[in-house]
């Protein structure tokens, strides 16, 4: 089972840069997309439902902003747009505030060869624009944690694909020394991810296959300066899975031969009958 995760930085822009044509060559079973930056009315039939796929989306209320989507060859048994009432916790940010930004889409596939499977497209907020958005990001992380705990305990196999906007370790970004006080590499953000892996029980699938890879692991490059040309990148896009599902991962790669956005596609193949 081949799963691709990609922050499109705008589905219309990425389509103009050839992403739909590229996807046809990939024959992926599931494609998780983030930062759609469009509403349904803005999208062509090819964007909504590429040939051979079912398309599902969770749009942001604000036009041209955020939004996530999933293409799947198999029709999902259930589609969950947003976190709704599944989130607990006592953070100041309301669930409605989070869901209005179109950041969570879950497709459930039941009675598969691995049991009941959920694939989620996730777009965690960035806090790089200022203190207000960083506060929102921390609040979303606090709100999201009980849901992540519940998913692990649900008995389903789960793969969460997306832009987490956090580089976990020093090997996950080029300039780690200069970014220790910057959003995306703050100690609190990194500790939160560590907790997901070490305490909650999630597995960083790429890292399970490539535990020491550095320069080749990056998935995002700033548009400023010559970040792409000099490979001054960050690994902030992940496929995070329940342990049994992660154990089925066979290969993981990052596609950089073409550029469809400021992110690169993360491609993972799972052993799946």
Residue ranges with predicted function:
Residues 84-96, 124-141, 177-182:
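Surface-exposed cleft-lining segments at the edges of enzyme active sites
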Residues 36-37, 45-125:
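Structured beta-strand-rich core segments of catalytic domains in phosphoester-bond hydrolases
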Residues 27, 51-54, 140-232, 236:
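Metal-dependent phosphoesterases centered on the DNase I-like endonuclease/exonuclease/phosphatase
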Residues 83-84, 204-213, 252-256:
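Acidic carboxylate-rich catalytic motifs and surrounding loops in phosphoryl-/glycosyl-chemistry enzymes
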Residues 1-50, 54-68, 196:
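N-terminal, active-site-proximal structural segment of metallo-dependent hydrolase catalytic domains
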Residues 1-9, 115-128, 161:
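Active-site-proximal beta-strand elements of phosphoester/diester hydrolases
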Residues 63-79, 224-247:
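Conserved beta strand-loop-helix elements of the APE1-like EEP
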Residues 6-7, 23-41, 119, 147-170, ...:
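Active-site beta-strand/loop signature of hydrolases that rely on acidic residues for catalysis
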